[in-house]
Amino acid sequence: MQTLTKLTLAALIWTAPASAETVKGLRTPGEFDSIADQTARSTALFEEMFVVIESPRCLNCHPVGDVPMQGDAMQPHQPPVVRGVGDFGATGMRCSTCHGAENVTFTTGEGSIPGHEPWQLAPIEMGWIGLTAAEVCAQLKDPARNGNRTLADLHEHNATDGLVGWGWEPGEGRTPAPGTQEIFGDLTQAWIDTGAACPAT
């Protein structure tokens, strides 16, 4: 009996780190420590960041054109809207016409109108839909296409920005982004600390 108990305990200890370091479908930076080559580890960290970036919660507001997407199926926004000046919608049909400071659940309880202050599209230079991980990575490191951000600024944006954080609290009827904003921020910092390497393709 003692042997069985020890074996069971050993099995629990052996398996605990793997389950503890994956949170809601997103791996934490510690899971990449076994990759000895720093560039390879950095690339792997970015590829894990891309798990969040390519989710509908992020892509819907990072279109490469003037029309945002919506829903988990990433359909064109209804009612029809356009980017407009400053990425806040067209005159007379601003994003804030429907989107308030917080999510509003439908009276039926099925679905909601998303909200955050401010509610806006990412600039067109930051469009991601259809881009590969390598292309998004290069874009994020390019001040001409990332809002003139340094890597430190990018970490702060990913880790603390409220509109980014909305992706994990998207309201009724939407699947949250994988993981948590804290882990996304930690992955971003670990990627930077290992050289901010990009995937080759």
Model-based region annotation:
Residues 2-44, 56-59, 64-69, 189-201:
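Post-cleavage N-terminal segment of exported redox proteins
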Residues 31-52, 68, 72-88:
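Electrostatic cytochrome c docking/interface patches
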Residues 44, 56, 90-93, 183:
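Short, well-structured alpha-helical interface segments that form or flank functional binding sites
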Residues 14, 52, 89-92, 131:
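Processing junctions and N-termini across compartments
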Residues 40, 56, 103, 109-201:
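C-type cytochrome heme-c attachment and multiheme electron-transfer modules
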Residues 56-65, 92-103:
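The canonical Cys-X-X-Cys-His
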Residues 62-64, 70-74, 107-111:
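Short, solvent-exposed loop/turn and secondary-structure capping segments
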